[in-house]
């Protein structure tokens, strides 16, 4: 009897535990959250609901609703109006993507999420999923992962998964909500002007700009989306129901909340001149599905989702209340998913808080090293042999930057927080070889000046050195949001500085620190070694030094084509066939090809590609196969190679791009080592948009190209037949 009683007690305990676990699971389910949100909505006043629809979604003490603090996280955490916390600043987006390793992007975002939580941030306005359109005059090029929709999709999904977490870890105490921006077609701007209108076909929208957002929603479950400043074919994105409802929500299945870009609901009045006042602008935004009004600094005179603007209109038109409830519900749902209702408010001492860790800063170095692209290396000038170098000139406006008294370093690029330190190229080289090599530093000129006053000192430094590291490019003074330009030359007198140093006859390594592809014809023709480093983050100088002296073999590849001249733009590898015959389809007196193509990058070693092979040379339209290629390191040092696969439907019912990237993989090979790299070929890789804009795989032949870059000479091909 006693045994039966004990067994009963154990069973009761077991089922109680199971019930509790099930209840816990259910309490966190979407259905349970919906019930909680509905209860709160029924208790909230109109004023309280409207207050919820602004950035930070402020706390409501009466109902126990927590706030949801925002920040930027493009390449590390930035608090937008504040610079504290000693946050880790990683390489800028264009640099991080140059690694061609999504897992590194994911790790960066995961570390950023931890730093965000440490500062009480739970909602970040990143990543930027804009596909670069090939017009480098546009200042925000640096925020993009590149010119290819597949590449941007892979990097974007990785970033979102890192920032938000996956599975049971999604939105937990170590992760935050990501925001995919700018929906959609933002870089298709006229004259390279930020926020310029986007006139394009629906085909181009779907082929180029929409895929990264589709992947963000369907694969990564992104929690928030931000529309672009611009209009799309005459209808501003912030009131564009076709984009925000029909495509984003109904077609893609997005179920998060939409946050405006800064002041953009208000700009329906002040920029687009559609709304006659802020109230009309607010109603247009609400009806289109914009849930949160971002006005940085919460300037009441710019806000649209504000009691003073909306309340009277809503009370006079009760039918509009459903839009208020809808927006508020989506924001409250996000707070529940983040677990904010159960968390204690975090008290931050801005004077002492330290968010970055040694682990994060070491990873920032690894990411910077893997992002560096070698564009040229005549006669194997690099790597330098420290035993043969007694003196080294370090010259250029971007060679060094002191800690700013206000804001953050200009050489980190846009959307950067303030790290505890920044390692410049000068710092990195001194640290690397300063005990054995005399470093002769001269600035030469300022990045945004036309004065040549510093030239004599720079020329002297070069003449008195065995070799020269010349660091030029751009900074946040000449690039970034609001940094649109009419030409792509090195700004100021930097080109003249390069010419002057070249005339000394000393071996020169040009290090580019920049945020956009530049027109660098003189450098490409006359300087033996060129390193593209973009904005390499807080450890940039260490990474550059490690590459220059051979401790790191550069393995990055371009994600953006370099134009020869501004007259070429837009320049990307995504081209359709040009007119052929009578010399047409070409520029007269100039080369229309890029100076450096998409996917290009050199190494201190060499690689040999075998002939690509298909598991099946013929498949059904709904079938799959695999293409494989052997890659061998034929050099003397270990190196990384990014193997790229491009696909073209040879003859189809609509015009297509000459080829499109559909797979890539970065591999490491020891000298003499061979690896086989394989890529899947199926619907996702072979489909096109037919005349009805539907994704289909059409019967016929497909050219599958595998190789080291998008350039035809770097690719080997095999033909696939689809029946």
Swiss-Prot record:
Keywords tagged on the record: Glycosidase, Hydrolase, Periplasm, Signal
Example GO BP: arabinan catabolic process
Signal peptide range in chain numbering: 1-19
PANTHER family xrefs: BETA-D-XYLOSIDASE 5-RELATED, SUGAR HYDROLASE-RELATED
Enzyme class name: hydrolase
GO cellular component: periplasmic space
Designated name of the protein: Beta-xylosidase
Subcellular location: Periplasm
Entry EC number(s): 3.2.1.-
Function: Xylosidase involved in ulvan degradation. Ulvan is the main polysaccharide component of the Ulvales (green seaweed) cell wall. It is composed of disaccharide building blocks comprising 3-sulfated rhamnose (Rha3S) linked to D-glucuronic acid (GlcA), L-iduronic acid (IduA), or D-xylose (Xyl). Beta-xylosidase converts Xyl-Rha3S, a product of alpha-L-rhamnosidase acting on Rha-Xyl-Rha3S oligosaccharides, further to Xyl and Rha3S. The enzyme is able to degrade 4-methylumbelliferyl-beta-D-xylopyranoside (MUX) in vitro.
NCBIfam families listed in its UniProt record: betaxyl_Flavo
Coarse class of the protein's main subcellular location: periplasm
One Gene Ontology MF term: xylan 1,4-beta-xylosidase activity
Family under the similarity heading: Belongs to the glycosyl hydrolase 3 family.
Domain of life: Bacteria
């Amino acid at each position: 009897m006693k045994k039966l009683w004990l067994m009963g007690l154990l069973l009761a305990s077991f089922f109680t535990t199971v019930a509790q676990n099930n209840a816990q699971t259910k309490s966190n389910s979407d259905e349970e959250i919906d019930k909680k949100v509905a209860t709160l909505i029924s208790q909230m006043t109109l004023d309280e609901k409207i207050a919820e629809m602004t950035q930070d979604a402020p706390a409501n003490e009466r109902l126990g609703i927590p706030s949801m603090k925002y920040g930027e996280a493009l390449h590390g955490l930035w608090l937008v109006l504040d610079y504290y916390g000693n946050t880790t600043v990683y390489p800028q987006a264009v640099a991080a993507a140059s690694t061609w390793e999504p897992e590194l992007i994911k790790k960066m975002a995961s570390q950023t999420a931890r730093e965000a939580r440490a500062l009480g941030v739970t909602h970040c306005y990143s990543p930027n999923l804009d596909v670069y359109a090939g017009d480098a005059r546009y200042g925000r090029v640096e925020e993009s992962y590149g010119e290819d929709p597949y590449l941007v999709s892979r990097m974007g999904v990785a970033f979102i998964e890192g920032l938000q977490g996956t599975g049971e870890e999604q939105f937990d105490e170590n992760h935050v909500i990501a925001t995919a921006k700018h929906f959609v077609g933002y870089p298709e701007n006229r004259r390279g002007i930020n926020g310029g209108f986007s006139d394009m076909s629906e085909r181009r929208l779907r082929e180029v700009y929409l895929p990264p957002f589709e992947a963000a929603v369907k694969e990564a479950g992104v929690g928030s989306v931000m529309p672009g400043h611009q209009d799309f074919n005459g209808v501003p994105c912030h009131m564009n129901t076709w984009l925000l409802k029909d495509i984003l929500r109904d077609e893609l299945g997005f179920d998060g909340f939409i946050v405006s870009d800064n002041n953009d609901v208000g700009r329906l009045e002040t920029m687009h001149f559609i709304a006659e006042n802020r109230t009309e602008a607010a109603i247009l935004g609400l009806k289109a599905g914009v849930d949160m009004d971002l006005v940085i600094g919460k300037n009441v005179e710019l806000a649209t989702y504000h009691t003073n603007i909306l309340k009277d209109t809503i009370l006079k038109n009760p039918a509009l209340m459903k839009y208020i409830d809808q927006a508020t519900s989506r924001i409250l749902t996000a707070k529940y998913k983040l677990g904010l209702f159960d968390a204690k408010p975090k008290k931050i001492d801005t004077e002492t808080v330290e968010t970055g860790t040694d682990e994060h800063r070491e990873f920032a170095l690894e990411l910077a090293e893997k992002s560096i692209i070698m564009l040229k290396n005549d006669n194997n000038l690099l790597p330098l042999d420290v035993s043969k170098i007694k003196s080294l000139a370090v010259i250029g406006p971007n060679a060094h930057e002191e800690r700013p008294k206000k804001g953050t370093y200009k050489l980190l690029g846009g959307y950067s927080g303030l790290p505890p330190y920044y390692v410049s190229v000068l710092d990195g080289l001194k640290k690397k070889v300063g005990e054995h090599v005399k470093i002769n530093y001269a600035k030469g000129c300022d990045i945004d000046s036309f004065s040549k006053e510093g030239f004599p000192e720079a020329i002297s430094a070069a003449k008195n050195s065995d070799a020269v590291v010349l660091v030029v490019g751009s900074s946040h003074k000449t690039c970034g949001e609001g940094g649109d330009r009419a030409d792509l030359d090195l700004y100021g007198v930097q080109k003249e500085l390069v010419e002057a140093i070249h005339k000394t006859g000393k071996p020169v390594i040009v290090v580019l620190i920049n945020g956009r592809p530049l027109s660098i014809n003189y450098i490409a023709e006359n300087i033996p070694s060129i390193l593209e480093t973009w904005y390499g983050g807080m450890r940039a100088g260490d990474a550059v030094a490690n590459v220059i002296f051979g401790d790191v073999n550069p393995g990055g590849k371009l994600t953006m084509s370099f134009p020869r001249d501004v007259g070429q733009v837009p320049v990307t590898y995504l081209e359709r066939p040009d007119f052929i015959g009578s010399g047409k389809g070409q520029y007269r007196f100039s080369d229309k090809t890029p100076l450096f193509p998409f996917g290009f990058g050199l190494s201190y070693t060499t690689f040999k590609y075998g002939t690509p092979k298909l598991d099946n040379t013929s498949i059904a339209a709904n079938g799959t196969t695999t293409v494989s290629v052997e890659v061998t390191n034929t050099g003397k040092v270990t190196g990384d190679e990014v193997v790229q696969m491009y696909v073209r439907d040879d003859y189809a019912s609509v015009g297509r791009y000459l080829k499109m990237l559909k797979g890539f993989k970065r591999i490491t090979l020891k000298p003499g080592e061979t690896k086989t790299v394989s890529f899947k070929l199926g619907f996702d890789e072979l489909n096109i948009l037919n005349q009805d804009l539907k994704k289909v795989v059409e019967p016929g032949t497909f050219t599958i190209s595998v190789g080291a870059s998008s350039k035809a000479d770097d690719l080997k091909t095999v033909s696939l037949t689809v029946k």
